[in-house]
Structures are given as C-alpha cells and as structure tokens.
C-alpha cells in the first residue's frame, strides 16, 4: 500500500477527505521521544504536526544547528513535521536575577537557530511555580478520571523550601524586559513565540503573582511588543476556566494575528479562576465546534493540540510511554474529535461560500 504525505491511500484520494493545508489548522501531539513506534502511532491517528518539550540533549543551552536539524530530519523521515518546541526561559529571567542577560542571550541564540532551521514556533511559560497542588482526580463518566481544581486547596500554601516569591508588578517588569530583548530577534528569524496562559489560573501561586491568569493579562502581554511574533497559546479550556467566551477571545487575538499555538480541551467551571473540572472534550461548557469554526474562519495555519484527555482504563491497563505520559488511547479520542470538528468546520464554511 502506497500512502502520500497526508497518509491517504492512492485508491481513496479525494473521497471525502479534507486535507490540512497552509490555510487550515494542523493537529499536533507532544512526543516524549522520536522513536519509530511513537512516530508511527501518531501518524496512524492522522497527526501531521509534531511538538516536543525539549531536544533530547536538554535545554536551550544545548541547542545548535546540527542538533535541531537532527530532530527535524528525524520527524521528516516519517513524513511528519516538527513545528513546535517548548522551552523554559529560566528562573533568572523570570525573577530578574543576576545572570538574566546571559540567559536572554541563550534564548536569542536558540531563536536564531530555530529560524535558520525553519522551526516556526517556540512555546514557553513564564511563572515562578505551576500550582498543580490544587488538582485532584475525581470520577467522570464510566469511572474515568477527571482533573479537578479548587483554589481552596492551595490558597494558603507557602513558598517551596528554598524558593522566593515575586510580586505581580515585578513579574510584569521582568517579562517586559525579556520581550523587548527577544521579540525583535524572533521577527528577524521568522520564529513565532507563544506564551501559554497560567494553568491552573489561580491568582496566587505559593505567594507569587501570575501574569497570565486573566484575559486582561493576556492582552497586556501581547501589547508590550505588538507583533505577531509576540503571541499566545490560545487555550479554549483555560479561557472558559476564567469565565470568558472562548470564541470571542479567539476572535480578539486572531484579528491581531497573535495566536501562535492552540490548546483544544473542555471544562466545567463553577467559579472562574478558582473552581473547575477538566472533562471529556465532548461534554463541557465550551462549544468546541464554534471554537474550531472560528479558527477555520480565520484561516489559522498553525498547530492545534487536543490536550489533557481524562484517565481511562485502556491507558491504565496498556500504558504507552511515547506520547505525553501514557495517555495514547485518550489522545486517540481527542485527536479524532478535533479532526472531526475541523473537517465539519471546513465543510460547513465551504458550503456557505
């Protein structure tokens, strides 16, 4: 059997297939490794875009042209594309500590390498601590495990041992300093940066502020250097966790060309920022078809990551360690759902032209 790059057998090309193009989103999964079995499994799901958390050699300080090209070529051997790499700016940048200029130079060097090797997106976080202590697993449909967050579990937690705290104003000063240094380089390199919202979006994380815990913060962040290269990871789940309409917020940032990556998941929010449950992608408060339709309407051309599938028996009984912490069956479900939403949105909008 001979398949083309999109994974479609010659005999069924054109038979009801909506290909991902330069004017449509592309589904992605994060891979823990680039082994043959991992690449094969995501390709079987129709995933074309690959994301990774870092190079197999470590953080940004290990980046060079040869190293990044090796990863890109490895993915290309499977007729897939490496299109996003997560990175950690480092504590000295986030806290504004001595040595941050050296760390900013490390980020700049990595961006320039990414540009030379045609890596289109680099995604990052900017927080002192991710307050995951507020999560617990609660039962969902059929006994599946859902991630539940409540701020009461973490609101009085002290800083971690040996760690300091930082105010919201200080964080804004530090991210401003950072962005003004790196965004001009990203523009020259044609590499878009995507800052992920705080998730969980609690106002305080072990005594420190969180700049990306409100939509107002997202807007402020993108206004520091108004550029498509200074963008966000638009997460429709986090948007709903904050009590906002995901379609409206998607349109706001899309009109400014500052959506550089998308996370696609559903939630049930009881109190914005403070109390919510991540649920199966087909059962929450987010109108997932409306979100996908808005992205398709915008001709958003970058990655969509259908993240955070609930725990399920299949993954518990038959773990697979190549894809985002042993949740292959869960991701098969979320990928299939996201692909169906995208195909439906493309077909619907084509029919109304």
Where are these regions (language model features)?
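Ligand-binding pocket scaffold of soluble enzyme catalytic domains
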Residues: 2-10, 17-60, 67, 74-78, ...
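Histidine-acidic metal/acid-base catalytic patches
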Residues: 2-25, 39-43, 93-96, 104-105, ...
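A diffuse structural propensity rather than consistent per-protein peaks
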Residues: 35, 64, 167, 285-287
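Active-site-proximal loop/turn and secondary-structure-junction residues that shape catalytic pockets
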Residues: 31-35, 56, 88, 126-130, ...
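Structural motif corresponding to the early beta-alpha repeats
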Residues: 53-176, 187-188, 238, 301
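Conserved beta-strand positions in the central sheet of alpha/beta enzyme cores
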Residues: 49-51, 84, 123, 194, ...
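Residue-level detector of alpha-helix boundaries and kinks
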Residues: 35, 56, 99, 160, ...
